[in-house]
Amino acid sequence: MTDMVYAGQVALVTGATRGIGAAIALTLAERGVKVIGTATTDEGAGKINAALAGRVGCRGVRLDVNDSAAADALVDAIVKEHGALHILVNNAGITRDQLAMRMKDDDWDAVLDTNLKAVFRLSRAVMRPMMKQRYGRIVNVTSVVGA
């Protein structure tokens, strides 16, 4: 079902390998959006490619959302390839659930880096092209599960 409102737009969906992110990526693709879904591994990117197979302009890519340079490079590549980036869905997330008194600093830092700092980094990366095209949507997803 193509949706004339979204058809032809370009979306970047982080954490698109499974769960909420996979559902968002597939739903957007079904509505005619060119979806670039991110995964933390090449295997995950392959799963996204399989899920979006046959949909023009859709693909999975590997991205460390905690790497600012990689995020900037991906956004630049998307804009260069498609001429625009209309939608960012910040969905990537992790959890390191345990009692606070047992949580290690490294685990806490990893959760904040992925669930908070990466949202800022990716949002910052898309702001310039979105402002230049005078259109853009940033959607931030949270979950109790975190992944």
Regions found by a protein language model. Name each.
Residues 55-57, 77-88, 96, 107:
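A glycine-rich helix->loop->beta "capping" turn
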